């Protein structure tokens, strides 16, 4: 552990944020507890991440989680890779499909659209960024500009998280660690520096405050206004 996280008792102003996070992920990430040392930073991050990751958009939620995994894997952040793969499973992506991510170019588990998105995420995670006109042209065969913009927002958010968690060697929580050990070790995943036995998040799961329940209810029912597009037949698009 490189920086001691804030305790939830000393971050009461984020009770609603933590409750929403628990409802979505099943736990409060140690990365957020470390971020809570700077309340203004966590407040801004929580709002942005809810907008990009939780709010329903025009991309399939499972595909979002898969590209989160791929950009994290490409950037070398094992913490975020474990989180993203675990989130994909929570969003009903089959575990055998997650296990096939290391061979997504050849695997029959993935559609051509998914391969294009994963290829794009893989290139975006490299330093320097390896996204070129070829990757964009391939994306446009399957996604419209608004869907691509949503995808880039996800990748940009993960760029911040990859560097945050890799630089801090954030200890990986039990849930995503167990999932990664079961399903990602075959494609090269290792906990490495994120394996810390100090219980940073020992708090029992708390009941969700009414305000947080209302926020989640609104998020799950919000849909952007549909726009006429030749891509509206794609499963990730809003009907």
Regions of interest found by a model, annotated:
Residues 1-239:
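Hydrophobic alpha-helical segments
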């Amino acid at each position: 552990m490189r920086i001691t996280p804030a305790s939830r008792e000393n971050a009461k102003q984020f009770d609603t944020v933590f409750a929403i996070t628990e409802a979505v992920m099943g736990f409060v990430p140690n990365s957020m507890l470390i971020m809570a040392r700077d309340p203004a930073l966590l407040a801004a991050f929580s709002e942005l991440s809810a907008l990009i990751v939780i709010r329903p958009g025009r991309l399939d939620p499972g595909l979002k989680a898969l590209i989160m995994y791929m950009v994290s894997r490409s950037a070398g952040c094992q913490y975020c890779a474990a989180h993203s793969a675990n989130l994909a499973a929570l969003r009903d992506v089959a575990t055998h499909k997650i296990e096939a991510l290391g061979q997504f170019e050849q695997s029959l588990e993935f559609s051509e659209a998914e391969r294009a998105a994963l290829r794009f995420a893989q290139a975006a995670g490299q330093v320097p960024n390896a996204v070129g006109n070829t990757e964009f042209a391939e994306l446009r065969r399957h996604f419209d500009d608004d869907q691509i913009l949503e995808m880039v927002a996800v990748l940009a958010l993960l760029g911040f998280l990859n560097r945050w968690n890799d630089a801090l060697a954030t200890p990986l929580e039990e849930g995503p660690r167990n999932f990664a050990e079961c399903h990602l070790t075959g494609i090269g995943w290792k906990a490495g520096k994120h394996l810390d036995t100090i219980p940073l998040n020992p708090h029992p799961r708390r009941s969700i405050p009414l305000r947080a329940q209302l926020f989640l209810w609104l998020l799950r029912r919000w849909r952007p206004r549909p726009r006429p597009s030749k891509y509206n037949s794609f499963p990730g698009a809003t009907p």
